[in-house]
């Protein structure tokens, strides 16, 4: 199962964890190399970082479809308004047998019919593009909902904090070969011994 990618991407410098959680060079390097591309740490602290799958195509497709569909819809509405709102001209002039056909009026009326047909076609194309836009948007939202999982709070805390042992919060880099921290004072050879005050006895 791939690790969840609900972690918000932030480009701010410095650690963004609570105080007392992570210490040492290793944790700060992990925070530094965690960029806004969706890089997340795996459950294994020693394993390589796992990149979150990026899906730019659904978002890009529905944005392009929405823009194109809106533009075509506006053009179609304008063409239909022109075709139906503008009154046609009379093609025949005269009465009875003396009927003269006005070619300009015929061309004008034919242009109005072409505007109506073009407006209908543009509206149909806009509807198809808007349907594709809605389809891609639903695919993107469903994929985000199905692949999103809650983060495990124990997976983020790679270093455990103990109240009695503060030197365990340090990174292994700051430890020598014997396992002792460089910043902690050396252990006393006498162990934890209590200091007693001895007073000399007075001669009576």
UniProtKB/Swiss-Prot annotation:
GO terms for biological process: nervous system development. Residues 178-204 are annotated as: Disordered. Coiled coil: none annotated. One of its GO terms (cellular component) is neuron projection. The chain crosses the membrane at residues 66-86, 122-142. It comes from the Eukaryota. Residues 190-204 have a biased composition (Polar residues). It is a multi-pass membrane protein. It is found in: Membrane. Pfam families: Neurensin (PF14927). InterPro entries: Neurensin. Keywords: Membrane, Transmembrane, Transmembrane helix. May play a role in maintenance and/or transport of vesicles. Belongs to the VMP family. This is Neurensin-2. The lineage of its organism: Eukaryota, Metazoa, Chordata, Craniata, Vertebrata. The gene is NRSN2.
